[in-house]
Structures are given as structure tokens and as C-alpha cells.
Amino acid sequence: MIPGQYQIADGEIELNAGRRTLTLSVANSGDRPIQVGSHYHFFETNDALIFDRASTRGMRLNIPAGTAVRFEPGQSREVELVDLAGARRVFGFAGRVMGDL
């Protein structure tokens, strides 16, 4: 092996395999762009985003870590969410949960 060399297995890497997902339509009713990061608790996003908020409790965007989705003013788009993993305890964000899901 050469220092720094990558040894990558053949095939595709599937993100969040086996976890429950949800696809829903989200609209930005505000007058400014809103960007949501990959691990932000979607239930607690900006109130200008219009969607079935209750159905998103305990979920985040199903996108690669470190990336984000941007919603321009007046824009509507479909997004896919995935269940949060781990201990399923949420603190911070908008302060709407602050504990166990």
C-alpha cells in the first residue's frame, strides 16, 4: 500500500440503507432564500417553509453529509427525508423538541 492510497470496494454505496424515508412537497412562502443542512431536524426548520410539519418529526434530509438544499422565495420542491438514527434525542435547533423523540 502506498501512503494516502485509497482502496475502494467495487459497487455503489447506499446512504441510509434500511431506514424509513418520506417524500413531501416543501414551499418557501418567505421573501428570502432558506437553506437547510443535511443533518438539521426538518421539523424545526424556518416557519416560512410550508409543509406537513408534524409528519417530519424525527427526520432530516436524505442527502450526503455536509450538503444542503436551498429554497428560493416562492419556490416549491419535493424533498426526501430519512429518520434520524442513534439515540433519537434532539436538542437545540429551534428548541421545539429538546429531548427524546
From Swiss-Prot:
A biological-process GO annotation: urea catabolic process
Compartments where located: Cytoplasm
Family, per entry: Belongs to the urease beta subunit family.
Broad class of the protein's primary localization: cytoplasm
One Pfam match: Urease_beta
Cellular component GO terms held in the UniProt record: urease complex
Reactions listed under catalytic activity: urea + 2 H2O + H(+) = hydrogencarbonate + 2 NH4(+)
GO MF entry, a single one: urease activity
InterPro entries: Urease_beta-like, Urease_betasu_sf, Urease_subunit
Leading EC class: hydrolase
Organism for this UniProt entry: Ectopseudomonas mendocina (strain ymp)
Pathway: Nitrogen metabolism; urea degradation; CO(2) and NH(3) from urea (urease route): step 1/1
EC number(s) from the headed UniProt entry: 3.5.1.5
Protein name: Urease subunit beta
Protein keywords: Cytoplasm, Hydrolase
Subunit structure: Heterotrimer of UreA (gamma), UreB (beta) and UreC (alpha) subunits. Three heterotrimers associate to form the active enzyme.
